[in-house]
UniProtKB/Swiss-Prot annotation:
EC identifiers of the protein: 2.7.1.30
Organism in which the protein naturally occurs: Petrotoga mobilis (strain DSM 10674 / SJ95)
Pathway: Polyol metabolism; glycerol degradation via glycerol kinase pathway; sn-glycerol 3-phosphate from glycerol: step 1/1
Transmembrane parts of this sequence: none
Gene Ontology terms: cellular component: cytosol
InterPro entries linked: ATPase_NBD, Carb_kinase_FGGY, Carb_kinase_FGGY_CS, FGGY_C, FGGY_N, Glycerol_kin
Name of the featured protein: Glycerol kinase
Length: 498
């Protein structure tokens, strides 16, 4: 009987289950969207129970579509939207509040207080992160401070915290396993990425009891088995990585200096810096790429908050396209952007600016500006933001990138990928298997149970689907990019109630 690896890819807008065979090919896939809650401006929430229900739904769907039995699954890998914070009752398993999503900005004032106390450098030295509402630490504090009875229960050891990986494993094991991996822990702003442990000083500063926290383990090992009553069989859960780190692993960026960019709701570029963490001087994050076989690989990361979400905005709010795929058609209907720039700073700007008070703007409009110009400028904004990050990355690492590996939904947009290559001046490579995030989690799980023999075997499985090479003249590239920099300045520091 053939064996497979099940990958759970729990994202910001949907839950997905992908089943891979030994060649790393997708055998079956299922996806289900779930609700986004926006209780106040700048607030973004998910219902953890809906995340769980959709996850179980897509697993059943993927198994049925592939005609695969539970007994044919060798291991389960989990990859997840990072930073998103769930706190639940240890006895009942019931969340005390909706999950606070990574995009949520409600804790900006808590972050401002940390900065006023002069803690920015301390936090950066310990965690590799900026002080920002993006990360889990201040979200945990907010829930404990604002949900009635939560702090008392936490102090009594009756609550549990987890990022989404932790929540799903808790549920899959019927409350037996409370665990996360290095990559997810490295996104909480309370985990010391050098000592590889929760940081007591930061927990004290944010008033977070340590009894809340999961055990932190490598990204590839058996954490426990699924509960037979919950899952239908006892199957090892053997791989965990935050979505961007999983994509890095799935793109087999195992060598120092290799980089990938994932085009999803946001855009995330990671460069493997090997076993040596590089502290950024240019607005990037130092993060853990993966931990495997007793070693930890670090990465520099540029987190861009809004890329694919800007395309959703064109579709859902402005209603000027019917689907994301339409953007390529409209973008090619005009010869250039017509001087129009869209800065999609809907929730502020991430790397390398870290401006929580920036807001979205469209500049350069004239009477001749058309729908096609706005669509094209929105796509171009994704490529410009990626260049912002790459310039910072090259400055920090001293490594000149030759090729960027790409994945995610928008990586299938050929117009965008060609423009990306043009504006960076480097080659852009798209793999045959675009499901690199899920593939990375599958690889981590498969390695832990001996389904694959080692990373060398995985290197041989990576295959290129398309190569985009720069075709734009240098002066044109720099002229367009200079326009983008001017547009960003217009968007910055827009919100005044600081």
């Amino acid at each position: 009987m053939e064996k497979y690896i099940l990958s759970i890819d729990q994202g910001t807008t949907s839950s997905r289950a992908i089943i891979f065979d030994h060649d790393g090919n997708v055998v079956s896939v299922a996806q289900q969207e779930f609700l986004q809650y926006y209780p106040k401006p700048g607030w973004v929430e998910h219902d953890p129970n809906e995340i769980w229900a959709t996850t179980m739904g897509v697993i059943a769907d993927a198994m049925a579509r592939g005609n695969i039995k539970r007994s044919q699954i060798s291991a389960i890998g989990i990859t997840n939207q990072r930073e998103t914070t769930v706190i639940w009752d240890a006895e009942t398993g019931k969340p005390v509040h909706n999950a606070i999503v990574w995009q949520d900005r409600r804790t900006s004032k808590i972050c401002d207080n940390l900065k006023e106390k002069g803690l920015e450098e301390t936090i950066k030295h310990k965690t590799g992160l900026m002080v920002d509402a993006y990360f889990s630490g201040t979200k945990i504090k907010w829930i404990l401070d604002n949900v009635e009875g939560a702090r008392e229960k936490a102090e009594a050891g009756k609550l549990r915290f987890g990022t989404i990986d932790t929540w799903l494993i808790w549920k899959l094991t019927n409350g037996k396993v409370h665990v996360t991996d290095y990559t997810n822990a490295s996104r909480t702003m309370i985990y010391n990425i050098f000592d590889l442990k929760w940081d007591e000083d930061l927990l004290k500063e944010l008033n977070i009891p340590s009894s809340l926290l999961p055990e932190v383990k490598p990204s590839s090992q058996i954490y426990g088995n699924t509960d037979a009553d919950v899952f239908g069989a006892e199957v090892p859960i053997a791989g965990i990585a935050g979505d961007q780190q999983a994509a890095t692993f799935g793109q087999v960026c195992y060598e120092k200096g290799m980089a990938k960019n994932t085009y999803g709701t946001g855009c995330f570029m990671l460069m493997n810096t090997g076993e040596d963490p590089i502290e950024s001087k240019h607005g990037l994050l130092t993060t853990i790429a993966y931990g495997i076989n007793g070693k930890v690989n670090y990465a520099l990361e540029g987190s861009i908050f809004v890329t694919g979400a800007a395309v959703q905005w064109l579709r859902d709010e402005l209603k000027i396209v019917d689907s994301a795929a339409d953007t390529e058609y409209y973008a090619t209907k005009v010869k250039d952007n017509g001087g129009v720039y869209v800065v999609p700073a809907f929730v502020g700007l991430g790397a390398p600016y870290w401006d929580m008070y920036a807001r979205g703007t469209i500049v350069g409009l004239t009477r001749g500006s058309s729908k096609a110009h706005i669509v094209r400028a929105t796509l171009e904004s994704i490529a410009y933001q990626t260049r912002d990050v790459l310039e910072a990355m090259e400055a920090d690492s001293g490594i000149k990138l030759k090729t960027l590996r790409v994945d995610g939904g928008a990586a299938l947009n050929n117009f965008l990928m060609q423009f990306q290559s043009d504006i960076l001046g480097v080659e852009v490579e798209r793999p045959v298997v675009n499901e690199t995030t899920a593939l990375g989690a599958a690889y981590l799980a498969g390695l832990a149970v001996g389904y694959w023999n080692g990373q060398e075997e995985l290197l041989r499985k990576w295959k290129r689907d398309a190569l985009f090479t720069p075709k734009m003249a240098e002066d044109e590239r720099e002229r367009l990019y200079a326009g983008w920099k001017r547009a960003v300045e217009r968007a910055r520091n827009w919100i005044e109630e600081k």
